[in-house]
From Swiss-Prot:
Its main location: nucleus. Residues 1-69 are annotated as: Disordered. Present with 6960 molecules/cell in log phase SD medium. This is DNA repair protein RAD51. One of its GO terms (molecular function) is single-stranded DNA binding. Residues 1-34 have a biased composition (Polar residues). Keywords: ATP-binding, Chromosome, DNA damage, DNA recombination, DNA repair, Nucleotide-binding, Nucleus. NCBIfam families: PRK04301.1, recomb_RAD51.
Length: 400
């Protein structure tokens, strides 16, 4: 893990982490904060350095200064700018409150929002909307960079381990943060089980494939089982109670509710460090809330809005987004030429919204097959993994 990555993660946890996640802060940083005022804020770090009591923290501050002098910025590493930073040049606290009430909790959220969305907020005039966009653009880098700089930023991305070395190798290290990974397949192919495993591995330290953050889990089918997290947490050396407390769970009951939950998710992620969002499954409610060809256009528009909101959360907070998807059988004449007539639902909207698409199939016993169907950087390949009591892993000798 690079020095830049270490600095970013440690600083994010000190500023936004709470509860048991503070235990993931390196021992020297955690101790320094406790010896200060005990609340882990960035102001305490500066105060400690100023008083001459923060030897290790002084080095951290110098490292931060060096990092700021380099080309890569914090936004590229998944950090975010608090929306309060917009309170300049005529933008008041009342304006910030209006933005928060409308679901915009970071400067990035304002910068990425279309102008017409800002104008729909009560009390935001055209002049104020322009001022908000200009100030957000000043804080959030949105211009051109060289391919070399972008390559450097991507080299700092974190990948979350799946619990299976075979699957991690297939994915180039694990599930990539900052993008959407879609898992599709029939029932009992391991999609939800992989989501349960990732809900735990996202909490483990970076040096063993984790993200040192919490998980936000949206369940649309009622398949989430906390008891599965207990055995998986024990496998990875985590306290089961801490692991459960670091998973924020919500059951979605309709497509509109599913979309509204992302507003609550944005607020939670602006207050604490998260490294993973799970939606299991993304299309289940759309299949029942929208029926027939007459509502197909409305369904796809709603789905596009939901997937765009997910991608914005990935962009703002640098989290990995994992969604599961169901399949449908093709009943047209193409079945005769296709050995596997099942395809993921959601159409082109779903296909274009997902960065990486993984197809899952059943195997022998507890074994499952995963295939890379679509990816901007991974070759088409497949691997075998297995599902055990302690989560997803590699097949064992007795199962082969």
């Amino acid at each position: 893990m690079s020095q830049v990555q270490e600095q970013h993660i440690s600083e994010s946890q000190l500023q936004y982490g709470n509860g048991s996640l503070m235990s993931t802060v390196p021992a020297d940083l955690s101790q320094s904060v406790v010896d200060g005022n005990g609340n882990g804020s960035s102001e305490d770090i500066e105060a400690t350095n100023g008083s001459g009591d923060g030897g290790g923290l002084q080095e951290q501050a110098e490292a931060q200064g060096e990092m700021e002098d380099e080309a890569y910025d914090e936004a590229a590493l998944g950090s975010f700018v608090p929306i309060e930073k917009l309170q300049v040049n005529g933008i008041t606290m009342a304006d910030v409150k209006k933005l928060r009430e409308s679901g915009l909790h970071t400067a990035e959220a304002v910068a990425y929002a279309p102008r017409k969305d800002l104008l729909e907020i009560k009390g935001i005039s055209e002049a104020k909307a322009d001022k908000l966009l200009n100030e957000a653009a000043r804080l959030v880098p949105m211009g051109f960079v060289t391919a070399a700089d972008f390559h450097m930023r991507r080299s700092e991305l974190i990948c979350l381990t799946t619990g299976s070395k075979n699957l991690d190798t297939l994915l180039g290290g694990g599930v990539e943060t900052g993008s959407i990974t879609e898992l599709f397949g029939e029932f009992r192919t391991g999609k939800s089980q992989l989501c349960h495993t990732l809900a735990v591995t996202c909490q483990i330290p970076l040096d063993i494939g984790g993200g040192e953050g919490k998980c936000l889990y949206i369940d649309t089918e009622g398949t989430f089982r906390p008891v599965r997290l207990v055995s998986i947490a024990q496998r990875f050396g985590l306290d089961p109670d801490d692991a459960l407390n670091n998973v924020a769970y919500a059951r979605a009951y309709n497509a509109d509710h599913q979309l509204r939950l992302l507003d609550a998710a944005a607020q939670m992620m602006s207050e604490s460090r998260f490294s993973l969002i799970v939606v299991d499954s993304v299309m289940a409610l759309y299949r029942t809330d929208f029926s027939g060809r007459g509502e197909l256009s409305a369904r796809q528009m709603h789905l596009a809005k939901f997937m765009r909101a997910l991608q914005r959360l990935a962009d703002q907070f640098g989290v990995a987004v994992v969604v599961t998807n169901q399949v449908v059988a093709q009943v047209d004449g193409g079945m005769a030429f296709n050995p596997d007539p099942k395809k993921p639902i959601g159409g082109n909207i779903m296909a274009h919204s997902s960065t990486t698409r993984l197809g899952f199939k059943k195997g022998k016993g507890c074994q499952r097959l995963c295939k890379v169907v679509d990816s901007p950087c991974l070759p088409e390949a497949e691997c075998v993994f297995a599902i055990y009591e302690d989560g997803v892993g590699d097949p064992r000798e007795e199962d082969e």
